[in-house]
From Swiss-Prot:
Organism: Rickettsia bellii (strain RML369-C)
Keywords, ordered alphabetically: Ribonucleoprotein, Ribosomal protein, RNA-binding, rRNA-binding
Protein name stated in the entry: Small ribosomal subunit protein uS5
Gene (UniProt): rpsE
First and last residue of the signal peptide: none
NCBIfam families noted in UniProt: rpsE_bact (TIGR01021)
PANTHER family with a match to the protein in the record: MITOCHONDRIAL RIBOSOMAL PROTEIN S5 (PTHR48277:SF1)
Length: 176
């Protein structure tokens, strides 16, 4: 039984990195290309993939297929930002993602911006700390996105209702 994905043509594709790689053999050097692609539907689904081939277009296509296989769903707050602040790590890379007010825009550098644009995030503040290698930054960003949870999923995990999760300001007691 094969999986058929709807809206496959509606996916946005961003080529994040292209690199020429070399294999040294007895007769000389063999050149190939490596590509890293981020795909998303701009509605909460995003994936990243890596591909290698003799030609750039073939490498890009392989990377796109790999990214489609690795797509994940991310719950967004009001379809514009994340639910809470989160930190992601991968190797020497560390990223801090913070939710932002409406109208803030995407404040993120490099490959993180490609992920947020493909994801459909309109307001977010992201900071990269440590390594700025494309591969590790994307892996750290995906690590952070995996750590996100919506209030609905938290309520389900705790066997509580949604209104029990949120604290009312009138219920907070201040000790003087």
């Amino acid at each position: 039984m094969s999986k058929v994905r709807k809206n496959e043509e509606a996916l946005s594709e961003v080529l994040v990195d292209v690199n020429r790689v070399t294999k040294v053999v007895k007769g000389g050097r063999r050149f190939a290309f490596s590509a890293y692609v981020v795909v998303g539907d701009k509605a909460g689904r995003v994936g990243a993939g890596h591909g290698k081939a003799k030609e750039v277009n073939e490498a890009r296509e392989k990377a796109k297929q790999a990214a489609k296989k690795k797509m994940m769903k991310v719950s967004l707050y009001q379809n514009r930002t994340i639910h809470h602040d989160v930190i992601g790590r991968s190797g020497a890379a560390k990223v801090v993602l913070r939710r932002a007010k409406a109208g803030t825009g995407v404040i993120a550098g490099g490959s993180m911006r490609a992920i947020f644009d493909s994801l459909g995030v309109h307001d977010i503040v992201a900071k990269s700390i440590g390594s700025t290698n494309v591969y590790t930054m994307i892996a750290a960003t995906f690590d952070a996105l995996k750590k996100l949870s919506s209030p609905k999923s938290i309520a389900a995990r705790r066997d509580k209702k949604m209104n029990e999760i949120f604290i009312k300001s009138s219920d907070i007691q201040v000790n003087e």
